[in-house]
Amino acid sequence: MQQGWLSNWLVKHKVVHRSLGFDHRGIETLQIKAGDWDSIAVILYVYGYNYLRSQCAYDVAPGGSLASVYHLTRIQYGIDNPEEVCIKVFAQKDNPRIPSVFWIWRSADFQERESYDMVGISYDNHPRLKRILMPESWVGWPLRKDYITPNFYEIQDAH
C-alpha cells in the first residue's frame, strides 16, 4: 500500500501506526493507537495542522471496537489547496478511552462531547465531557450497533 509523507515520517521516528491509504480526494488516512494519539496530535499541530476540520466517531462492529476520526487541515496564508490528513484512533468497546485534543484544537470541544454522547467514547482530560444532545439521565449510547432502543412511545396530539 502506498504511504504518504506523514506515514513515512512516523516510520522514520519509530512511531507505531498503520497506513490506511488515501481516500478519493488523495487525503492520507492513518490508524493510531489511543496511547500514542496525544503525542502525535502535538507533532501534527507543531508541523502546522492548525485546524481541526471535523471529528466524528463510529462503531466498527458489534463486539469490536469504536473509532474516533479526526480530519486535520494545515492552513497557510496564500495556499489554495491546504494539506489534509485523516487520523483514526481506535478504542476497545469495554473501555473506550482516547486522549482529548481539546487542549490543542479548541474546536474539538463539542465534537468530542457529541461522540461521547452518541457512541460512548470517553475523552481523557476533556474539560466538560458530558452529554450534549441526549438528556443526562439517558441510558446507553444510541449510535452503537449493540444499542437496544428503550421501550417507550412518543405521545402525539391527534390534531
UniProtKB/Swiss-Prot annotation:
It catalyses: a plastoquinone + NADH + (n+1) H(+)(in) = a plastoquinol + NAD(+) + n H(+)(out); a plastoquinone + NADPH + (n+1) H(+)(in) = a plastoquinol + NADP(+) + n H(+)(out). The lineage of its organism: Eukaryota, Viridiplantae, Streptophyta, Embryophyta, Tracheophyta. NDH shuttles electrons from NAD(P)H:plastoquinone, via FMN and iron-sulfur (Fe-S) centers, to quinones in the photosynthetic chain and possibly in a chloroplast respiratory chain. The immediate electron acceptor for the enzyme in this species is believed to be plastoquinone. Couples the redox reaction to proton translocation, and thus conserves the redox energy in a proton gradient. GO terms for biological process: photosynthesis, light reaction. Its EC number is 7.1.1.-. It comes from Brachypodium distachyon. Pfam families: Complex1_30kDa. The gene is ndhJ. This is NAD(P)H-quinone oxidoreductase subunit J, chloroplastic. It is an enzyme of class 7 (translocase). One of its GO terms (cellular component) is chloroplast thylakoid membrane. Transmembrane segments: none annotated. It comes from the Eukaryota. NDH is composed of at least 16 different subunits, 5 of which are encoded in the nucleus. Keywords: Chloroplast, Membrane, NAD, NADP, Plastid, Plastoquinone, Quinone, Thylakoid, Translocase, Transport. The keyword Chloroplast applies. InterPro entries: NADH_DH_suC, NADH_quin_OxRdtase_su_C/D-like, NADH_UbQ_OxRdtase_30kDa_su, NADH_UbQ_OxRdtase_CS. GO terms for molecular function: NADH dehydrogenase (ubiquinone) activity; quinone binding. Belongs to the complex I 30 kDa subunit family. It is found in: Plastid, Chloroplast thylakoid membrane. It is a peripheral membrane protein.
